[in-house]
């Protein structure tokens, strides 16, 4: 996480100053809650998303036979903050999904369990729904809970703990928990833990969530939007009301007139307190290469403030619950020119003079 955040801010831009023009936003179809997975006896971080190709436009991942310069050119056809989006990139399409899976009990005996929840980020008064499912040889197994609690795990000096009550429903133990009852003032990591007796042995399971209390919300989307074509790219202007100044990162996905994913965009800048225009640039060549046309609409609009030196170090904004639809732009309204920048040209020049690895893996001259 730290490495990724360093990368976000090494090229931070200047803060926008103009408020986005007001338009009407529509409510999207609700996404189905994702299943989450359990943890073992030891406390571990949530599992990462399943592997996806970071650059689907380059085809199936594997050993490249390109020389470094060619490989670099292929990887940088599009800018790092606006890239193609495909239906298999669930980490972007379902950014609050968890990825726990059914796992074997420590003692074996054919027992497996899944301890999970319906989300990873919880904000304000939201309710976290968690489930514990236990099976023996694939069949549901009734168990007795010996412990169940939630506690603050970060910051480490704050150890609020509350007991959790689970109820059985269809062979699955279920709980609803409101982190707001902990009375926290800032973004915190919260761990949920259970211990159960399956008739042979006891087993512990654990997962973490990140919670942002109402008092700790750094900024909100106002619901005002605008769209334009600038320098051959689609720009969606998003109005943001900032309470806590600092470095922000805001992401959104773009879908075409057929509701197919087209592109992902990231805005990053230092924002002062007040209302600002976060300009999400969807690169023109991404749209042209997808042969996409409008009206486009955005989804999964979310953001966070980077709080350096804190743990957790991302203060979440409430995701925007609606959508915004652009005008009916034709495909040829956008440029098919490749991304270019001074940094890209410097890297091309550097790689062009480096003959050490010429030929790449599996090739020679």
Feature locations, PLM:
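Short flexible loop/turn segments that cap and initiate beta-strands
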Residues: 135-163, 248-251
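Conserved, compact domain cores that house catalytic/ligand-binding motifs in diverse enzymes
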Residues: 227-277
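Contiguous beta-strand segments within globular domains
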Residues: 103-142, 228-237, 247
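Juxtamembrane proline-rich low-complexity "stalk" or linker regions positioned immediately after a signal peptide
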Residues: 11-95
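Hydrophobic membrane-insertion alpha-helices, especially the h-region
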Residues: 1-12
């Amino acid at each position: 996480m730290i490495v990724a955040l360093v990368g976000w801010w090494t090229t931070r831009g200047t803060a926008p100053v103009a408020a986005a023009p007001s338009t009407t936003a529509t409510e999207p179809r609700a996404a189905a809650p994702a299943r989450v997975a359990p943890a073992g006896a030891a406390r571990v971080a949530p599992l990462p998303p399943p592997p996806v190709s970071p650059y689907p436009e380059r085809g199936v991942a594997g050993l490249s036979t390109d020389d470094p310069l060619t490989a670099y050119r292929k990887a940088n056809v599009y800018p790092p903050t606006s890239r193609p989006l495909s239906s298999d990139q669930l980490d972007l399409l379902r950014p609050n999904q968890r990825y726990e899976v059914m796992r074997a009990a420590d003692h074996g005996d054919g027992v497996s369990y899944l301890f999970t929840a319906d989300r990873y980020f919880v904000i304000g008064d939201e309710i976290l729904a968690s489930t514990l499912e236990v099976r023996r040889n694939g069949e549901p197994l009734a168990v007795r809970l010996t412990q169940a609690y939630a506690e603050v795990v970060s910051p480490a000096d704050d150890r609020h703990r509350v007991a959790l009550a689970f109820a059985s429903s269809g062979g699955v133990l279920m709980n609803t928990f409101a982190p707001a009852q902990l009375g926290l003032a800032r973004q915190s990591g919260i761990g949920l833990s259970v211990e159960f007796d399956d008739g042979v042995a006891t087993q512990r399971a654990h997962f973490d969530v990140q919670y942002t209390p109402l008092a700790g919300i750094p900024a909100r989307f106002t619901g005002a939007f605008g769209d334009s074509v600038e320098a051959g790219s689609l720009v969606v202007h998003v109005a943001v009301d900032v309470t806590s100044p600092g470095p922000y990162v805001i992401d959104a996905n773009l879908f075409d007139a057929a509701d197919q994913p087209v592109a992902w965009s990231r805005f990053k800048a230092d924002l002062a307190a007040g209302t600002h225009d976060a300009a999400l640039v969807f690169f023109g060549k991404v749209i042209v290469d997808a042969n996409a046309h409008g009206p486009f609409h955005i989804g999964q609009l979310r953001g966070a403030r980077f709080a350096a030196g804190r743990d957790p170090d991302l203060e979440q904004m409430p995701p925007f619950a609606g959508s915004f639809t652009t005008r009916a732009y034709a495909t040829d309204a956008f440029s098919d020119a490749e991304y270019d920048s001074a940094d890209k040209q410097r890297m091309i020049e550097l790689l062009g003079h480096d003959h050490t690895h010429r030929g790449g893996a599996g090739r020679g001259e």
